Amino acid sequence: MAFGVEPPEHVTPWFKPVYEATFQFGGVAWTLCYILIAREGMRTKSYGMPLFALANNFAWEMVYALWVVDNAFEKTAMTIWMLIDTPIIYSILKHGVLEWQHAPMVSRNLKSILVGLIALCAAAHWSWQSWWIGNEMGKRDDLEGADLTQMAYWAVSMCQFLVSTMSLAMLCVRGHSGGVSWMIWLSRFLGTLIGLNMNYAWAYYTWPEAHEYFMSAPAVFVWGVTTVCDIIYGFVLYHVKSNERELSDGRKVAAEADDEQVGGWSKMKTGKN
């Protein structure tokens, strides 16, 4: 959302090329991540994006693609992400019951819960952008209206915060790597690190008066926790992969899962009692 903003003369001419290159790298990396999550979910009969994080990301893409962004690359990327989200959503609805057998109320109502979460998150994103733009938040002398770059920063940062923290929590709770892989982690980690954090860090370094919010206490907390969780995720993934079991149908289960649990999953899958 900053592609149309022209920096003042004192800002290095490298500002826009580096800013756009890092942003586009993030877009490509996250597109690859979504594709791999969809593929791995089908292959392992699981899903790799936490339920609330997926609902929030889908709602964000929908609201911003349809109503907020005007740059062609951003609009195209968000539309593509929405389309790629479809098989991920399918994986949750088809295989999520296997991951939620410990919570029957959730497993029986996954569809309703997902639809409700998407609606809730869409309302939140719509309210945020409507309030920000309507009140011209972040307005500066060199801007007409609200600072859309800052608005996008807070919205995207919270999306990534949820994905990073919840993905780590999901991996720890499951104890298996169903729906995820090394390439999924790497593309997600680098997409966020370079496409978001380094992107705005460069903007802050070269044009600090317009991007001082990047080093504010809330922002440092958000991108700091996001980065730490993404790094820790790699170590946890290694531990989980070293100890999990793969079943004959491609599903993965925690090393400590007993035969009764595995049998329960098979019954839930086939619908047998």
UniProtKB/Swiss-Prot annotation:
Induction: Expression is induced on AF medium. Keywords: Isomerase, Membrane, Transmembrane, Transmembrane helix. The chain crosses the membrane at residues 18-38, 49-69, 78-98, 113-133, 153-173, 178-198, 217-237. Disruption phenotype: Still produces ascofuranone but impairs the production of ascochlorin and leads to the accumulation of ilicicolin A epoxide. It is an enzyme of class 5 (isomerase). It is found in: Membrane. Its EC number is 5.4.99.-. Ascofuranone is a specific inhibitor of trypanosome alternative oxidase (TAO), and quickly kills African trypanosomes in vitro and cures infected mice. As an essential factor for trypanosome survival, TAO is a promising drug target due to the absence of alternative oxidases in the mammalian host. GO terms for biological process: terpenoid biosynthetic process. It is a multi-pass membrane protein. It holds the Pfam family Pyr4-TMTC. It catalyses: ilicicolin A epoxide = ilicicolin C. GO terms for molecular function: isomerase activity; lyase activity. Pathway: Secondary metabolite biosynthesis; terpenoid biosynthesis. One of its GO terms (cellular component) is membrane. It comes from the Eukaryota. Belongs to the paxB family. Terpene cyclase; part of the asc-1 gene cluster that mediates the biosynthesis of both ascochlorin and ascofuranone, a strong inhibitor of cyanide-insensitive alternative oxidases and a promising drug candidate against African trypanosomiasis. The first step in the pathway is performed by the non-reducing polyketide synthase ascC that produces orsellinic acid by condensing acetyl-CoA with 3 malonyl-CoA units. Orsellinic acid is then prenylated by the prenyltransferase ascA to yield ilicicolinic acid B. Ilicicolinic acid B is further reduced to ilicicolin B by the reductase ascB. PANTHER family: PTHR42038, TERPENE CYCLASE AUSL (PTHR42038:SF2). This is Terpene cyclase ascF. The gene is ascF.
